[in-house]
């Protein structure tokens, strides 16, 4: 009975998944198509969340893919994949993990598909991004925050 009450309090639901922003640039085409294809792929990930209402949150996953070929930019693709989630009655640490890792895990396949589609429409070889471990990224973020806090110099007491 107590477990049922706890599960009822810690509800989670996806309200909506949406594409917030998208950009595709191929600054060196069509010249890029005449070169041997040996790409150097750089992926940047970022997440952001904000509360929309009581227990309702918007989470944005930003992916930026920059592909260079022979030191020239072949293409740059930026996607902001958004989601609106209900996350009620969670402890602060659980909510932070939910918004910083669990929700981005849900959004990533949608963003990955959008990037793949844009790359193919640009007539470049298909780009399949490997899955991201948002749990590990979130833990790394927490460790960095903790070490920054520990390294921050203590403020000198104000003199009277």
UniProtKB/Swiss-Prot annotation:
Belongs to the SecB family. It comes from Aliivibrio salmonicida (strain LFI1238). GO terms for cellular component: cytoplasm. GO terms for molecular function: unfolded protein binding. The keyword Metal-binding does not apply. The gene is secB. This is Protein-export protein SecB. Coiled coil: none annotated. Keywords: Chaperone, Cytoplasm, Protein transport, Translocation, Transport. InterPro entries: SecB, SecB-like_sf. GO terms for biological process: protein folding; protein tetramerization; protein transport. It comes from the Bacteria. One of the proteins required for the normal export of preproteins out of the cell cytoplasm. It is a molecular chaperone that binds to a subset of precursor proteins, maintaining them in a translocation-competent state. It also specifically binds to its receptor SecA. Pfam families: SecB.
